[in-house]
Amino acid sequence: MLKKVFLKTFKLDKFSQLLYRENSYNCIERFIERETSNYTISIQTNILLEKFQKYISQLSNADLAFLLIHSGLIPEHYKPDSSEETFYSKLCEDLIREWSVRIGFTKSYLPTMKSSTEDVTILNDRNELIVCDGKAFRLGRSQAAPNVKDMLKEGDISKWLHPHTSLYTTIGGMVVFPSTHDWKSSTDFYQYTSNKKQPILALNYEHLSYMLIKGITSDFIINSLKNYHEIFPEQLRKKDSKIKNRDKYYENFENFENYFFGDDLEFWNLFKEFSSIVINEKCFDTASKLTTRIDSVKASIIQNFLCTRQISQNPYPIRILPS
């Protein structure tokens, strides 16, 4: 249960009511269902995206912050590689774009060419550019040890930055992913993302939410990437790490210039506790809906089986009259 003191602290008081939380948990799924049902043929992604951008632009910072906390979790009942799954992933990417605009990257956009490009192009008025890879996964997918290549291929960020170098000041990269699919031990991923030769910020959706709530601006992201050599003077190699390089990564990042925490480490720890409760409730909501769907399908199968058996046992079979 969400403690009201958490909600008051983060100015999310309305979410003390379950109805508002459930609306947020199901926000993207219901949006897709509502918009796709209005078309007799498949809706194009760009049309759906336009509608979604208009919708989320009207959300308050509090609504967007709460939505970000539990983002990146694809509904389990979507078929693999289905249009619904594609839509959901794309709309999660657009949440990142909307977040970046609100903290000061006012020229951010989603590239129209998907192949071999970043998911979100993050850009400010000074033409400083960051390429971002936004991730969304199913809860049922392996969480304890995700495949590193599914998260980020080494060299991708450099490849995506290259086409922008002639027009913009390229700063580095970002990867945003749900904390439910983070590693529990050292991994090549945090070795890649701690390489000062190619700065790459690895952030959970909760980090984005926290920045929005605390009023942390785009300058923090820019300064972090520009001073990556100070945050990670040495690469956090998987085999050399005395502690988990995942833990060391966030210890270094979150303590950089004491800017992320500010003077209030307690606030950040409270927010992480709050976020964990929100995500657990979201997971429970997902599991409950999946169970309901399974029970419904099971009941339908049983009903069809009984009807079939009743027909096969009919003592008065249908006779075909001679022609």
Q: Where are the regions a protein language model picked out?
A:
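Interdomain/boundary linker segments immediately adjacent to catalytic/signaling cores
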Residues: L2-F87, F274-S323
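Conserved alpha-helical elements of sugar-nucleotide-dependent glycosyltransferases
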Residues: Y88-C92
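A short acidic/basic microdomain associated with nuclease active sites
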Residues: E93, R97-V120
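Catalytic cores of nucleic-acid endonucleases
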Residues: A136-S194, A202
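Charged, structured surface patches that assemble and position nucleic-acid processing machinery
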Residues: F189-S300
